[in-house]
Amino acid sequence: GYGIQLSVNSIKLLNKIEFNKFKNDKKYNPEKINFYSIKNSKKICDLNISDFNLEDCKYTTLKRSDLIDFLKRDLKDLIKTNHNISQIDQDNNKIKVTFENNQFSECDHLIISDGVFSKGKNLIMNTNAQPKYNNTLAIRGMISNPSEINCENISLYLGPDFHHVIYPVNSDRDLNFIAIMRYKLSKEEQKNYI
């Protein structure tokens, strides 16, 4: 599974459902983000993200699949899978989510995490945002503990027309890799990605 980075604020929320008991070997708490030039791999600067940590809420990286497994296991009765939202209404302090199968749920809080061009966001904002290709591609994958890469922290390489970030996702120091690059796709090729 690909990686995910969780801020101190998101960990604070997850700890309310006992994320603090999540296995330590399946997550990682990097201390810094190191910024490098992609041209010569020289370090530009760093940001000590551990300065923002609290005792029980630390900036955390892990595999998405491990986070999903945790949520499914501990919240299986509250998480709805294979449901498509058709309507979101808010009245006073309650939120009513209606699904395409005409079932509904009421809640106090709603977290929408369905991507940049989110159907949920469109329903709340009453818009229909569509993706617009801007001649860039994102590539992601996993790397197993290479010796030439700093496995302790987040490494962000910056350059013209190409950036990539590498960060550990567990105590085995498996690394998540994400690259953003300029790349022009034909209209026909774009249909495969939208």
Residue ranges, per PLM feature:
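Glycine-rich FAD pyrophosphate-binding loop
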Residues: 1
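Conserved N-terminal helical subregion
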Residues: 7-125, 129-142, 184-194
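Short, conserved charged micro-motifs
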Residues: 149-150
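Active-site substrate-recognition segment that forms the wall
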Residues: 153-188
